């Protein structure tokens, strides 16, 4: 038998255990500062937000990991979102934070990308413990996955912590609508 510990909601929220509002738990400290990143793709090439493919585009930046069950649920949706909106100016960037074994042997990451048909930019950003150092502009970045929505001007316009799995029914369907709606709103804006 496995032991479980219950925590009252107010105590959990106070200690950061569970987000009380998934759209506000993780936020960008200074909205005037652009989202910056630097990480390696699966070929070992360094990619940053200044890469020409991102210029003037709306970005969905996903903090993910191949070890994270909800990241497995979110990846196919992000691939679908990318295919639907890339022609309108959307780029999706995964910043994957992996354990030492995955960093040493990229086959698991390659299998993750292949399994979900990921054709958006997939970068290896470091270990989970380095997330605060690699993404210093974020506050309360302590749950996987976390997704940032970045306007054409490079500034964070929204974030979402966690991902409601397909088994959650209406929660999942609503989250898909929310993500799509925010992407459409950002795409409609001219930078």
How would you name each of these model-derived features?
Residues 73-116, 127-134:
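Structural microenvironment flanking redox-active thiols in thiol-disulfide oxidoreductases
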Residues 20, 143-191:
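Thiol-/selenol-based redox modules, centered on thioredoxin-like
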Residues 2-40, 52-56:
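N-proximal helix/coil linker or "cap" segments that precede and/or mark the start of modular domains
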């Amino acid at each position: 038998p496995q032991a479980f510990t219950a925590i009252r909601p107010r105590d959990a929220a106070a200690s950061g255990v569970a987000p009380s509002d998934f759209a506000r738990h993780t936020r960008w400290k200074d909205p005037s500062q652009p989202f910056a990143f630097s990480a390696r793709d699966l070929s070992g090439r360094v990619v940053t937000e200044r890469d020409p493919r991102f210029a003037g585009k709306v970005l969905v930046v996903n903090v993910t990991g191949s070890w994270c069950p909800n990241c497995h649920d979110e990846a196919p949706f992000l691939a679908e979102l990318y295919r639907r909106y890339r022609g309108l100016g959307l780029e999706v960037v995964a910043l994957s934070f992996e354990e030492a074994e995955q960093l040493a042997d990229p086959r698991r990451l390659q299998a993750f990308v292949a399994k979900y048909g990921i054709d958006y930019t997939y970068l290896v950003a470091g270990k989970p413990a380095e997330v605060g150092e690699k993404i210093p502009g974020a506050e309360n970045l302590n749950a996987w996955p976390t997704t940032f929505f970045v306007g054409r001007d490079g500034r964070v316009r929204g974030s979402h912590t966690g991902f409601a799995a397909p088994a959650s029914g209406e929660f999942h369907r609503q989250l898909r609508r929310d993500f799509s709606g925010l992407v459409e709103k950002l795409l409609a804006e001219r930078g």
